[in-house]
Swiss-Prot record, chain A:
EC class name: translocase
Organism phylogeny: Bacteria, Bacillati, Bacillota, Bacilli, Bacillales
Name of the protein described by the UniProt record: Ribose import ATP-binding protein RbsA
Biological source species: Bacillus subtilis (strain 168)
SMART domains: AAA
Lineage: superkingdom: Bacteria
From Swiss-Prot, chain B:
Compartments reported by the entry: Cell membrane
Pfam families registered for this protein in UniProt: BPD_transp_2
Transmembrane residue ranges: 22-42, 48-70, 77-94, 101-121, 126-146, 169-189, 219-239, 294-314
Keyword flag Transport: yes
Protein family (similarity comment): Belongs to the binding-protein-dependent transport system permease family. AraH/RbsC subfamily.
A molecular-function term among this protein's GO annotations: transmembrane transporter activity
Annotated source species: Bacillus subtilis (strain 168)
Keywords linked to the UniProt accession: Cell membrane, Membrane, Sugar transport, Transmembrane, Transmembrane helix, Transport
Main location: membrane
InterPro entries given in the database record: ABC_transp_permease (IPR001851)
Protein name (database record): Ribose import permease protein RbsC
Any one Gene Ontology cellular component term annotated for this protein: plasma membrane
Organism phylogeny: Bacteria, Bacillati, Bacillota, Bacilli, Bacillales
Length: 493, 322
């Protein structure tokens, strides 16, 4: 299928989201669509699949002008959209998920399970997926759920699959599996639109790339004719001299130390420390137990055994309240789920852990609250019209900044950041890194969990590698390489 | 984002906010106009004062329910708490306890019953609907056991106690004054203190609230206790007004309270809503009851009309947010 979108314009209210975007997709190609958050990628794809209607512009498919009136119609014509938030019904079986809304039934309306199973099996075989059709989809890993979605798309005979951030929650192994599948699909003439922030993947899997900025197409080119720096430059419209801002660490005393900590079934015998002004990177494969570790250190879950030492004194953290009182902040990996009150103002979000500091007589001093919040909004350059804007309406990067702001407010001694730049665009990433560096200059100790190796290498002073719930190695930043970390992360020596 | 975009975004948010705040007021206003056109005596001061006295009981219960619903919970046991605490208060008075002291003890009993709800929901990890459905049944049963199914009468002639449900102060019914005082205190609690902010935060996103260091369990237990306390206070007013405790008092009061909260624009999924809205919701229900009585509509039809008004209000609210 060949798709041609020409001069697409779209406004939401008074917001001009797209102003003259052109996009072309050839049969059997993997086409990267890149741009910062808010550049208009999703809107463009939603126009293609009929969720939104363009104000102006042409869409032709195989040379014929075609406009879909809703995503279902697009799907029937062979264009499937796999969203970042997967459409999975966790309580239903894999089979039920595959045929949701497209169940095959006899004339009497009875489901023909055997027929559906055969079809599903055939599709899974083609993708070489080995998944039981009768297990609940919620029990599958995110990677497997993604495969369910792909299989679902292919069963509708999709010729074009749009994937929005498909690897955001996948393990390394699942990513390479996904790439195998994409390569196979390509051979069969299926085209893929690949939306991602991960530059390494774009260069690994894509044939062509279209870069968008502020609702316009900046460039479309063959991936072999461009490079990392050029893409970034076109995306942000300026040169990013270094991805990871430099800093000279001045390390102080151990502020936080954990000794022989274990939580049954998650991790075992974990010991490490972090000094003031230091960034300790925690690397490892997805599911190695890093997030569980951080949750237990912060008191969300209970430690079964082990000791926590803060500023040289043995202490206990039984719940998050105690952690906050002792100067710990926790930026969780899933900001929408655990970090933000989405339908609440930025002001109230930032104020939340800090309420007592401006409620001297038990009543909130609204003036002091406003000053406090304004200061943090400015300091973190959160882009918003007003502190009353709800968190939901912010871009990923700005949402993350709100979460960071609320913890900076408490004046933390130790900050735990779990995947601090997930789903954050390049420009905001850089701002978050700069902020982390500034915090360390003021003596804050940072523990950063990240699945992005370049980020671990670029930001950490020391790197701890976790493998299957145990610390498999500790490397000084100077001696660290991607290969060394991956070896430790996969259980090698 | 460009500044121009940001400004339109700001305007839109502002407009939505205003609509959300004004909706219930507008509803009440229109209702009052309709009722007073159909029967001008509705607006007579005596009737208005009467209305305020009538709504006090539902008001107190609904205020407590507002906090509960803001955390994303529900309390079906408020009517049963009212009945049980009323029976106990009446029993104490009959056996010679000073009535004022009895009312205070009754409120404490209400708070303890509410606390049981709170503990079941937090420590027992039960769904609020189920937990309070069960305690509602238990409290109702205990009331029947204690009263043996008969009203408790012979509450004496204590002046203070009689004033509480029937008296007037400066020409205003005492229950109305109690309700307004409770409203002011609770409004400050909800909008001006960290406790109120935390109430919203728990309803908005409980996990995020926990990670932000909020003592979720404690706040919730306190809120269910508050709901119990306010129910008991409403029960004392009812007991004083009827000069007796009825074994079946407060039946379906929980539903009127929930209706008032919802009419006031508070979201049943928690995190959004205002106590002023609840006050308006209480007045809307009160106006309906009072107005339909004035118009001589049979009590059977009154229920139908009340139900339809709730449906319309919620439908309009849906439209607005869509």
């Amino acid at each position: 299928m060949q798709i041609e979108m020409k001069d697409i314009h779209k406004t939401f209210g008074k917001n001009q989201v797209l102003s003259g975007v052109s996009f072309q997709l050839m049969p059997g190609e993997v086409h990267a669509l890149m741009g910062e958050n808010g550049a208009g990628k999703s809107t463009l794809m939603n126009i293609l699949t009929g969720l939104h209607k363009a104000d102006k512009g042409q869409i032709s498919i195989n040379g014929n002008e075609t406009y879909f009136s809703n995503p279902k119609e697009a799907e029937q014509h062979g264009i499937a959209f796999i969203h970042q938030e997967l459409n999975i019904w966790p309580e239903m079986t894999v089979l039920e998920n595959l045929f949701i809304g497209k169940e095959i039934s006899s004339k009497l309306g009875v489901l023909q399970t055997r027929k559906m199973k055969a079809l599903a099996k055939e599709q899974f075989d083609k993708l070489s997926v080995s998944l039981s059709l009768d297990q609940e989809a919620g029990e599958c890993s995110v990677g497997q759920q993604q495969m369910i979605e792909i299989a679902k798309a292919l069963m509708t005979n999709a010729e074009v699959i749009i994937m929005d951030e498909p690897t955001a929650a996948l393990t390394e192994r699942e990513i390479s599996k996904l790439f195998e599948v994409i390569t196979a699909l390509k051979k069969n003439g299926v085209s893929i639109v690949y939306i991602s922030h991960r530059m390494e993947e774009i260069f690994a899997i894509c044939d062509r790339i279209t870069i968008m900025r502020d609702g316009k197409t900046v460039d479309t080119t063959n991936i072999s004719e461009t490079d990392f720096d050029e893409v970034v430059k076109k995306m942000v419209g300026r040169e990013l001299t270094e991805r990871y801002p430099k800093r000279t660490p001045s390390l102080g005393d151990k502020v936080f130390e954990v000794k022989n900590a274990s939580v049954k079934g998650s991790f075992e015998d974990v010991s490490f420390y972090v000094r003031s002004g230091e960034i300790v990177g925690v690397s490892g494969l997805m599911g190695a137990g890093r997030t569980e570790m951080m949750r237990a250190l912060f008191g969300v879950d209970r430690l079964d055994t082990g000791e926590i030492w803060i500023a040289g004194k043995k202490t206990a953290i039984k719940n998050p309240q105690e952690a906050v009182k002792k100067g710990l902040g926790f930026i969780t990996e899933n900001r929408k789920d655990e970090g933000l009150l989405l339908d609440t103002s930025i002001r109230e979000n930032i104020a939340l852990p800090n309420l007592s500091s401006f409620s001297p007589k038990g009543l909130i001093d609204h003036k002091r609250e406003a000053e406090f919040v304004d200061l943090l909004i400015k300091r973190l350059t959160i882009k918003t019209a007003s502190p009353e804007t709800h968190a939901r309406h912010l871009s990923g990067g700005n949402q993350q900044k709100v979460v960071i702001a609320k913890w900076i407010g408490i004046g933390p001694k130790v900050l735990i950041l779990d995947e601090p730049t997930r789903g954050v665009d390049v420009g905001a990433k850089r701002e978050i890194y700069t902020l982390m560096n500034e915090l360390t200059e003021r003596g804050v100790a940072i523990i950063m969990v990240s699945s992005e190796l370049p980020e671990i290498l670029g930001m950490s002073d020391r790197i701890i590698v976790v493998h299957e719930g145990r610390i498999s190695g500790e490397i000084h930043a100077r001696e660290a390489t991607q290969e060394r970390i991956m070896t430790l992360a996969t259980g090698g020596r | 984002m460009k500044t121009e975009q940001l400004q339109t975004e700001q305007k839109r948010i502002h407009f939505d906010g205003v609509m959300q705040k004004l909706g219930p007021f507008l509803g009440l206003f229109i209702l009052v106009i309709i009722v007073s056109i159909l029967n001008p005596s509705f607006l007579e001061p005596l009737n208005i004062l009467n209305l305020l006295r009538q709504v006090a009981i539902n008001g107190l219960i609904a205020f407590g329910m507002t906090f509960v619903i803001l955390t994303g919970g529900i309390d079906l046991s408020v009517g049963a708490i009212l009945a049980l605490s009323s029976a106990l208060v009446a029993g104490m008075i009959v056996s010679g306890v000073d009535p004022v002291l009895a009312i205070i003890l009754g409120c404490i009993i209400g708070a303890v019953l509410g606390m049981i709800n709170g503990l079941l929901i937090t420590k027992g990890k039960m769904a609020p609907f189920i937990a309070t459905l069960a305690t509602m049944t238990v409290f109702r049963g205990l009331t029947l056991v204690y009263t043996d199914g008969n009203p408790i009468t012979g509450l004496g002639t204590n002046y203070g106690f009689q004033m509480f449900g029937r008296g007037y102060f400066l020409g205003i019914p005492v229950p109305a004054i109690t309700m307004v005082l409770a409203f002011v205190i609770l409004w400050v609690l909800l909008h001006k203190t960290p406790f109120g902010r935390r109430t919203y935060a728990i309803g908005g996103n409980e996990k995020a609230a926990l990670i932000s260091g909020i003592k979720v369990t404690r706040v919730k237990v306190m809120i269910y206790s508050l709901a119990g306390l306010l129910s008991a206070l409403a029960g004392a007013i009812l007991t004083s007004r009827l000069h007796s405790a009825q074994p079946t008092a407060g039946e379906s009061y929980e539903l009127d309270a929930i209706a008032a909260v919802v009419l006031g624009g508070t979201s049943l999924s928690g995190g959004r809503g205002r106590i002023v809205g609840t006050l308006i919701g209480v007045l809307i229900i009160g106006t309906l009851n009072n107005g339909l009585n004035l118009l001589g509509v049979s009590s059977f039809y009154q229920l139908v009309v009340k139900g339809i008004v709730i449906l319309i209000a919620v439908l309009l609210d849906r439209k607005k947010s869509a």
